[in-house]
């Protein structure tokens, strides 16, 4: 009985350790994966034809994002809202390609970049974007704007 308890405890430790790794380890490969997603997404998002842009964004998201995030994005687009889940509805463009930075901090990836934005009065300005990106099972699962 004691041996079974030890084996179960060891198995539980292995499972918990695996779950922690899949939540995001911050290793160079994962940081580069998040960076590559935002590079590709910025190019797709910048396409002027909405139909082509949405198709390319969906394609990139299908590779790098969780099934749930992809499902929410498609559902939102078909309802006509077109909320941008990958940037927490801030947006991304070619300027982001030049200023994109990704670092791992306290269990999440912090993505920063500059974005050509426009205010309600249609005046252009450069926005500093900071996103907190959560990973699960080697896929982007959540994105939340911070600050």
Where are these regions (language model features)?
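Short, well-ordered alpha-helical segments enriched in acidic and aromatic residues
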Residues: 47-76
């Amino acid at each position: 009985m004691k041996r079974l308890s030890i084996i179960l405890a060891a198995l539980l430790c292995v499972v918990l350790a695996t779950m922690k790794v899949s939540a995001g380890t911050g290793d160079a490969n994962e940081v580069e994966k998040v960076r590559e997603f935002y590079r590709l997404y910025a190019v797709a998002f910048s396409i002027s034809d909405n139909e082509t842009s949405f198709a390319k964004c969906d394609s990139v998201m299908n590779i790098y994002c969780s099934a749930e995030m992809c499902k929410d994005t498609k559902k939102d687009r078909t309802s006509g809202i077109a909320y941008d889940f990958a940037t927490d509805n801030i947006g991304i463009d070619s300027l982001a390609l030049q200023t994109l930075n990704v670092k791992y901090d306290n269990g999440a990836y912090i993505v920063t970049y500059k974005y050509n934005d426009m205010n309600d009065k249609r005046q252009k300005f450069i926005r500093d974007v900071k996103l907190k990106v959560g990973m699960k099972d080697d896929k982007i699962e959540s994105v939340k704007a911070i600050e």
